[in-house]
């Protein structure tokens, strides 16, 4: 993080003045942030992220954090002698893996994020989809992306049936910052592991968020030559799916982002979480950053 004392006072004032139009525009608006990738594992980036979230809250916005935890889950599974298996970007989740996922996400990762935000001066509260009966889910039916006659059984991976945002809204009204682990529950009280990008996208839609911001380990969406695609429409995304440019873990991320854009979320951005204070650059400046997803 840049030491504010190293910046000349006039430059500090200029930075704050330039942010004012964005603070005014987004005051009272909800920002759903998917927190994942290197930003979750690098201590300096962790601190930057927490400070960014607290700043957004202090200037009158309503940040809601949905977090991943893939690397942490993988580490825990390796300690148990299990190897993670992925199909079309989704983790195959048997009963034992589901126990690990719940423990790592809700018991470790979520609490670390809550602690960092609170340490930075915010008031964060950790939730899973079980809290307040927020995220109801059912077993995901995964059809093969190349052969629709094939259906993959990936265990306790959930497809969202509904989201009740009342607990999130209640926390926002009391000046708390919700931090949500992507775990849902089924009709028989079984747990489901749900892709965090999908949860963030659906939650942004239900909350009628002003922005959905997805932090990644890349500058945004890249073409096959590695060039950044700064603006994508639904038609362009379909073409990138078809030719294999978008694959693996980016599949659910982009699909969820597009669904949110189609459902009326005002702005959907995929940005590089490896950049210090990436969120502030996206929300409080006019700097072109990452990839913007549009429905048309």
From Swiss-Prot:
Where does the signal peptide begin and end?
none
Q: Could you tell me the keywords of this UniProt record?
A: Amino-acid biosynthesis, Arginine biosynthesis, ATP-binding, Cytoplasm, Kinase, Nucleotide-binding, Transferase
Q: Might you name a Gene Ontology BP term for this protein? A: arginine biosynthetic process via ornithine
Pathway given in the UniProt record: Amino-acid biosynthesis; L-arginine biosynthesis; N(2)-acetyl-L-ornithine from L-glutamate: step 2/4
Function per UniProt: Catalyzes the ATP-dependent phosphorylation of N-acetyl-L-glutamate.
PANTHER family in the record: N-ACETYLGLUTAMATE SYNTHASE, N-ACETYLGLUTAMATE SYNTHASE, MITOCHONDRIAL
Q: What is this protein called?
A: Acetylglutamate kinase
From the broadest rank down, the organism's phylogenetic lineage runs:
Bacteria, Pseudomonadati, Pseudomonadota, Betaproteobacteria, Burkholderiales
Gene from which this protein is expressed: argB
